[in-house]
């Protein structure tokens, strides 16, 4: 069965400009060889993939990166017209187009199983991936002062800044209720985020590396409450405390001493002083092809509202990339949080944030990972503790098998003797379990590079 659709193809914006006698003129590209971003539009949704083209004497070869592997493509071009096909299982997509000043219109024919269902794609376009020649000569430190904050993780929000791997960003967040460092309400509550930041070169199938350089308190108060979430309680205890109203509890933050105390303590808690440990409740990227925006109170493969107390200064996060540029968001600052976020929130406050980014190419992950000087930590996020426990254990086992070249039995021996667990979050739709192992127990030498 063959389905053919005609549609606009903005082929590869490989527009080359020359300036002569003060006048800008355009000409067709000298070569199509190189790396591209191939985007297929399906029912108004864009699916972007890394594509590599090599052209020699009119012959086109290359691949697209899809489902953790490179799918070959082949075709031909005369410099004005281009044709290539992608064989993906039972499905073959044949692309044709005419190159005119870097833009092309054409058609695609899908033969065999159609990966998009009963209808063919509505269109496709491609552009050259960023060239290393465009990379700044040295990593930069960039300041970003947020004006707007967002309550969803989405690919449709315009990036606030384009940054390169190696760059460092200094910015700030509002608290979970939308209150800033001057105690002004800037946005509705619900974990509003700073961002998104577009990371050049990051593509679906890659891993975004986020290194948290600094987290600093920037105001003197935080807010929590006086209730425990039902998910953490027995039915008897919950019934006994059914009249709990989750009243706000105000904390005073002393950044110089590094402690938090109650602003209006009860007699029994008048001496309570706890050391602050600033952390980010939310670090996330945009969801992938066909996915609706994800609210900032939720978590999953994208990261998001993970509320894990080790996402703090000195930690490195690894997040699967699902959109070009990754589209990184940060927010939901906590001065301190106990495991599980049992109050339904933590010591909620605004923060000054400094982070750096990097990209690991073609190293797909099932979900978020965290690393610090002492531990490797794999997060499991699911609807139940059982599900999250299985996700976390499997993810950590896969991590040490692949990066430290261990066999399954070797990983089982190591984890059976050394694995530790934390319950990171029980307050939201997904619960979080973190499986972790001390790095001192891992095989010596550098882990395998992606």
Each model region followed by its residue ranges:
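Short, structured beta-strand/loop micro-motifs enriched in basic residues and often containing a Trp
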Residues: 145-154, 186-193, 294-302, 396
């Amino acid at each position: 069965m063959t389905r053919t659709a005609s549609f606009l193809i903005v082929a590869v914006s490989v527009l080359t400009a020359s300036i002569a006698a003060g006048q800008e003129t355009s000409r067709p590209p000298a070569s199509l060889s190189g790396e591209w971003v191939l985007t297929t539009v399906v029912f108004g949704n864009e699916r972007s993939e890394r594509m590599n083209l090599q052209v020699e004497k009119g012959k086109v070869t290359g691949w697209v990166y899809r489902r953790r592997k490179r799918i070959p493509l082949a075709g031909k071009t005369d410099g004005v017209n281009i044709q290539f096909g992608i064989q993906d299982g039972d499905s073959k997509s044949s692309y044709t187009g005419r190159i005119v000043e870097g833009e092309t219109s054409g058609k695609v024919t899908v033969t065999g199983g159609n990966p998009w269902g009963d209808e063919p794609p509505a269109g496709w376009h491609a552009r050259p991936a960023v060239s290393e020649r465009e990379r700044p000569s040295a990593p930069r430190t960039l300041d970003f002062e947020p004006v707007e904050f967002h309550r969803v993780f989405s690919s449709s929000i315009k990036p606030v800044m384009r940054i390169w791997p190696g760059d460092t960003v200094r910015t700030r967040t509002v608290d979970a209720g939308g209150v800033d460092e001057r105690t002004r309400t800037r946005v509705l509550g619900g974990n509003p985020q700073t961002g998104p930041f577009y990371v050049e070169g990051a593509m679906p199938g890659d891993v975004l590396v986020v290194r948290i350089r600094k987290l600093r308190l920037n105001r003197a108060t935080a807010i929590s409450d006086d209730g425990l979430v039902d998910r953490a309680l027995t039915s008897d205890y919950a019934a006994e405390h059914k009249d709990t109203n989750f009243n706000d509890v105000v904390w005073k933050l002393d950044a110089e001493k590094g402690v938090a105390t109650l602003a209006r303590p009860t007699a029994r808690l008048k001496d309570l002083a706890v050391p602050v440990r600033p952390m980010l409740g939310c670090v996330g990227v945009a969801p992938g092809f066909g996915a609706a925006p994800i609210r900032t109170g939720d978590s999953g493969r994208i990261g998001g509202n993970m509320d894990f107390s080790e996402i703090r200064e000195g930690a490195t996060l690894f997040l699967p990339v699902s959109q070009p540029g990754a589209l990184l968001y940060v927010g939901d600052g906590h001065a301190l949080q106990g495991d599980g976020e049992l109050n339904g929130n933590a010591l909620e406050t605004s923060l000054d944030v400094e982070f750096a980014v990097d990209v690991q190419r073609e190293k797909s992950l099932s979900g978020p990972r965290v690393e610090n000087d002492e531990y490797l930590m794999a997060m499991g996020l699911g609807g139940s503790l059982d599900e999250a426990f299985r996700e976390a254990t499997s993810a950590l086992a896969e991590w040490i098998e692949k990066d430290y070249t261990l066999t399954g039995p070797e990983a089982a021996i190591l984890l059976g003797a050394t694995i530790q667990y934390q319950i990171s979050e029980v307050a939201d739709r997904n619960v979080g379990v973190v499986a972790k192992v001390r790095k001192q127990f891992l095989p010596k030498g550098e882990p395998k590079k992606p």
